[in-house]
Amino acid sequence: MTEIDPNINEQEMAEVINSDKDIDSDSNTVGLTLFAQLQNQLRLQQEELLQQQRELLSQESHLQLLQSSHSSISNTWNFTQGLVVGQLSVIFLIIIFVKFFVFADSSSSIPSKFVARDGAGVIVRRDNKSTTSRDRHNGIGGKDSNLEPSTDDERLQNNRAKVSSILEKTYYDVNNHASESLDWFNVLIAQTISHLRTEALLSDNIYHSLSNFLDNSELPDFLDKINLTEIDVGDDFPIFSNCRIKHSKEDTGRLEAKIDVDLSDTLTLGMETKLLLNYPRPLTAILPVAMTVSIVRFSGCLTVSLVNTNDQEFQADQVARPSNGHTSTDNGNDENGKGSSSEDKKGGTALMFSFAPDYRLEFVVKSLIGSRAKLQDVPKISSLIENRLRTWFIERCVEPRFQVVKLPSLWPRTKNTREPAKPKDSDDTL
């Protein structure tokens, strides 16, 4: 803008102002035209860029289509190739299996001597490992250590080694361990005896079984039929206490449990019969006899141990048993012995028990003899019956004799599986 001279008049000042306005308007029009030209150039450049982008996108899409077509062709070929190879491999394996396993020649199979050792190769025998290490320490070859012991000394050493291993792994000191009370065992035995009493008294089972036994027994000619008059199975239970584990006195390498047993109860069996006098002629005289025998007290030391029925000492005892002079007292169990002989040959685990000679057994014998003039509680008869019962007990259960009861198999089986009965729904009861 031009500087205004203060000496100029108003008309000149107006002209100057108008000239300035014209100059400003001209400059504005020039700026607008320039701005419009720039906008047109920008639009043209943007359109060119968009066209180039479209061309690039079209080229990329075309390339992707080409690549996808090539990959699909290769994938289909790989899938077909894998399918064919898999089918061929399966057919090849089936042919090999049928040829070498289904139609294999029996002569080319494994010999029997190697087949018998398959189980030994599968089952881990820790005893063999311990004996092998022990034999190597003693200078014995490894091949001979796997053989079964052929002498009693070797078997005794093996039993001692097993017993020492058991005591070591269970942390039980035979010499210093305190005796146990066996309270839990008393509860289990009491429950078992209670169930047995219930079954015995149910429908008079014990009466019928004893009556059948007496009827089938062979009686002497001077005895008439025996009738049962009283049966009392008691209501108390034995108490086991003071249990301690000891080594066997016979030096057999076994462990045995010594348990004190005490029973204070009344177990009664009453019967009546007739004595027949058959001289000089049959049934010359008849003498009625009524008798009641009760066991009121028993206490003693029970020795229990687990044994193997295949041991030589038990096999020798079974062979020598028929030559024993007391076999006549077991006439009622001959059939059971014959039936169990086949089971004894198979062997297995058995429970061996016996009582110490210092046992205590008290009887109460009541007798009544005669028809009109009766003799009551004859001491001679009481002592005779008591001695006979003691002899019967000593010959079977008092040391050095013992009883061997074969234990059933504890292996779980389907036929032994049970489950609790489900209670009926309330809708069914209604």
Swiss-Prot record:
Comp. bias (Basic and acidic residues): 126-138, 335-346
GO biological process, one term: protein insertion into mitochondrial outer membrane
Cell location: Endoplasmic reticulum membrane
Residue ranges occupied by any SMP-LTD domain in the UniProt entry: 178-408
Lumenal side: 1-82
One Pfam assignment: MMM1
PROSITE patterns in alphabetical order: SMP (PS51847)
InterPro entries: Mmm1 (IPR027537), MMM1_dom (IPR019411), SMP_LBD (IPR031468)
Residue ranges of the TM segments: 83-103
Residue numbers spanned by region Disordered: 126-154, 315-346
Membrane topology: Single-pass type I membrane protein
Gene Ontology MF annotations: lipid binding
GO cellular component: endoplasmic reticulum membrane; ERMES complex
Superkingdom to which the source organism belongs: Eukaryota
Cytoplasmic-side segments: 104-430
Entry keyword set: Endoplasmic reticulum, Lipid transport, Lipid-binding, Membrane, Transmembrane, Transmembrane helix, Transport
Coiled-coil positions: none
Its biological purpose: Component of the ERMES/MDM complex, which serves as a molecular tether to connect the endoplasmic reticulum (ER) and mitochondria. Components of this complex are involved in the control of mitochondrial shape and protein biogenesis, and function in nonvesicular lipid trafficking between the ER and mitochondria. The MDM12-MMM1 subcomplex functions in the major beta-barrel assembly pathway that is responsible for biogenesis of all outer membrane beta-barrel proteins, and acts in a late step after the SAM complex.
Subunit structure: Homodimer. Component of the ER-mitochondria encounter structure (ERMES) or MDM complex, composed of MMM1, MDM10, MDM12 and MDM34. A MMM1 homodimer associates with one molecule of MDM12 on each side in a pairwise head-to-tail manner, and the SMP-LTD domains of MMM1 and MDM12 generate a continuous hydrophobic tunnel for phospholipid trafficking.
Domain notes: The SMP-LTD domain is a barrel-like domain that can bind various types of glycerophospholipids in its interior and mediate their transfer between two adjacent bilayers.
Family of the protein in this entry: Belongs to the MMM1 family.
Name the record gives this protein: Maintenance of mitochondrial morphology protein 1
Organism: Lodderomyces elongisporus (strain ATCC 11503 / CBS 2605 / JCM 1781 / NBRC 1676 / NRRL YB-4239)
